[in-house]
C-alpha cells in the first residue's frame, strides 16, 4: 500500500489502478470485444507465419527471417498489453503492482523498439536487393542477419532500463495511484509524480529518437535510394514490378511511424484533445492492424 505524506500525496504507491477509458466505464465490456478479436487474429496469423517460415527451407532467407522476427515481436507485444486490458474491461481487475507496471512498461517499449529495428532491417535488405542485386548474397549473410536480429533486440531492451531506474529511484512522490490508461505507459506514469520530471522527459525523448528517430531517417533514405534506382530502370514494366514489391513495406512503415509520431505528439504536447478519437488512435499503436503486419507483408511478397 502507498504511504500518505501531505495533501493526498503518496510515497511510492505499492499498487496502481488503471482507470481504463475515462467516461466510458459502463461500456468498456463492449469495447474489449474488438481488442480481443484483434488479439486472436494477431496470434493465429503470426503463429501460422512462423510455422510456415520455419517448416519451409526455401524461406530461410534474410527477408523472411526478418518477417518471422516481426511476427514473434507482434505476438509478444500484443500479449504484454491485451490480457491486462481485458482484465480491466471484462473482469474489473484494474490493479497492478508498481514493479509489475514497470516490467510491463519495459516489455512494451522494448517490443516497440524491436519492431522499429526490424522495419529498418527490412528496408535495408530491400534497398540492397533492388539497388545492388549482385551483392545481396555477399552483404546479407546468415551471420550478419543473426547480428542484426540480436542488435535490434538488445538496443531497446538496454535503452529502456535507465528510464525505469529514473522512475523507480528518482520519483518518490505521486499525487495519485490512478492511471488514466489501460496499460503502463511511461508518460502516463510520469505525469502522476509531483516531483521534477525534467530528466525523465529528456531521457524519454532522447531514447525515442535513438530508436525510432534514427530508424525513421535511415528507412527514409533507403527508400529514396530505391526510388532513384527504380526510376532509372529502362522498362516501364520493370519499374512497376519493383515498385509494387515496395508498396506493402511502405504501407507498414508509414502506418507504424505515423502512429508513433502521433503518440509522441499527443503525450508530450497536445494536452486538450478529443478523448475517444485520440484514445483509439493511440491504442492502435501497440495492438496493430486487423491483419497482422508480418502476415500482410508475406502475402504481398508471395503475390509479386
Curated annotation (Swiss-Prot):
Keywords: Cell membrane, Disulfide bond, G-protein coupled receptor, Glycoprotein, Membrane, Olfaction, Receptor, Sensory transduction, Transducer, Transmembrane, Transmembrane helix. Disulfide bonds join 101-184. GO terms for cellular component: plasma membrane. The lineage of its organism: Eukaryota, Metazoa, Chordata, Craniata, Vertebrata. Odorant receptor. InterPro entries: GPCR_Rhodpsn (IPR000276), GPCR_Rhodpsn_7TM (IPR017452), Olfact_rcpt (IPR000725), OR51/52/56-like (IPR050402). It is found in: Cell membrane. Its main location: membrane. Glycans are attached at residue 7. Residues 1-32, 83-103, 168-203, 277-279 are extracellular. It comes from the Eukaryota. The chain crosses the membrane at residues 33-53, 62-82, 104-124, 147-167, 204-224, 256-276, 280-300. GO terms for molecular function: G protein-coupled receptor activity; olfactory receptor activity. It is a multi-pass membrane protein. Residues 54-61, 125-146, 225-255, 301-304 are cytoplasmic. Belongs to the G-protein coupled receptor 1 family. This is Olfactory receptor 52A4.
